[in-house]
Every structure is written in structure tokens, then in C-alpha cells.
Amino acid sequence: MIYDIIGDIHGCFHEFMLLTKKLGYVWENDVPIHPNGRKLAFVGDLADRGPQSLQVIDTVISLVQQNKAVYVPGNHCDKLYRFFLGRNVQVTHGLETTVAEWEQADEKTKTRIRTQFMKLYENAPLYAILDDGKLVIAHAGIRGDYIGKSNQKVKKFVLYGDITGEKHPDGSPVRRDWAKHYRGDALIVYGHTPVKEPRWLNNTVNIDTGCVFGGQLTALRYPEMETVSVPSTMPYVAEKFRPFD
């Protein structure tokens, strides 16, 4: 299978549309379809912070329902799911923008979005193993010895990265650079931590180029191993592009 794997969108629907068109997709009935049968894949964090989270969610739901996309959840997806479950989550760190959009919708739309997003999340794999094990898509990455496993430890790593429990002065978590130690044969494609350019290291690539923070929205074309990006229309926030610890 041939894939176009898209980094963290975070509600940047305009850039998502531009990127899919640049990749050769044609929008039909509100979803991007590739004339050559390429399939989209998403590293998670569809919503929060950006201006059009519901449109991004709607599009991905439609694509997955039509078996035209692969979706794995990110930590923001996990939090939105818990919000929809009625759990006591803090409506902060970007979730407030998605909740505000959702609350402005009519009751029928609210029910549909909530129900369909919860189904999307519940049916999604924690991480995706594709192309006979040659490709792994995991939101914040995955250790080689975790591939094929599924437990709370693996879930925490896949959603949040290799966090130490410590915090930076701005409140963001300290993360170890797990990719430095990866020695596996599978290509791991991930996002979560914004980088200015796609970051290749030891058969891994981080394609979260910080669209919602004014960077770019990036896709990896697989198996071609080419990255394609479009510039963000959001204000640039330099401090969000932090090197790994």
C-alpha cells in the first residue's frame, strides 16, 4: 500500500486542504481522494488550538468510514475522548478551542460529532503496523521493544513520548530523545513534538512541523520517503519549537 502520512493537524483545516491538494488529492463530497489510490494516514492530534477542529474531525471520520485512511490517536484525541465520556478533564491546553466550537453547534451536530468521534477513537489502534511490519505510525513514537505490545506503559509512551515526569519552566514535560536509541528495521513515523523541519534519525521521522504554531503542515510520502509541506497561516510561536532533552 502507498500512503501519505500527515503530521499533527490541530484544527488547521485550511492547511490540511492545501497539503492534500499539493499531494495530488481531489476533494469529492468533502473528502480528499487520490486518483492513483494512495491512502492517507494520520499521526493523531486532529483537534485543539487551531480554528477548525470539527471540520478536520469530520473529514477524518468520513475517510476512515470509507476505508480511505488510517488513523491513530494522539494525546489531544485521548483527552477529547475523555471529555466526551463525561470525565473530569481540564479544558485547557487547546481543548477549550474544540469544546467552544462543539458547544456552538446545534444539538443534532453535537450528538453526531460526539458519537462518531468516540467510535473513531474506540476503533483506532493505539499505533498502526503497516506494510508487513516495515512501517509503524505512532503519535509520539514507540520504542522498538514495545512494537506488538499493548498495555498502559506502551499507551503512555505512544501518546506522550518518553517523558521523565519533570517539567520545563513553561510547564511543558521534559522528554527523552527515544529516537536516538532506536535500532529497529521498521520505519517509525511520529509527531507530537514540534520541529522546524522533518527530523530523520535512526529509521524514524518526526513530521510534526508545528502547523498550529506557525510552522508547516507536513506529510511523508511512503514508500517514496519524500516529505511535502505547506506553510501555516497561524502566528509563529518560536518557543514551541524546542529541541529534545
From Swiss-Prot:
Family: Belongs to the PrpE family.
Main EC class the enzyme belongs to: hydrolase
Function: Asymmetrically hydrolyzes Ap4p to yield AMP and ATP.
EC nos: 3.6.1.17
Keywords for the protein's UniProt record, in alphabetical order: Hydrolase, Nickel
HAMAP family according to UniProt: PrpE (MF_01443)
Cofactors demanded by this protein: Ni(2+)
Reaction(s) catalysed by this chain's protein: P(1),P(4)-bis(5'-guanosyl) tetraphosphate + H2O = GMP + GTP + 2 H(+)
Protein name per Swiss-Prot or TrEMBL: Bis(5'-nucleosyl)-tetraphosphatase PrpE [asymmetrical]
Domain of life: Bacteria
Example GO molecular function: bis(5'-nucleosyl)-tetraphosphatase (asymmetrical) activity
Gene: prpE
Record has Hydrolase as a keyword: yes
A Pfam short name: Metallophos
NCBIfam families assigned: PRK13625.1
CC per GO annotation: cytoplasm
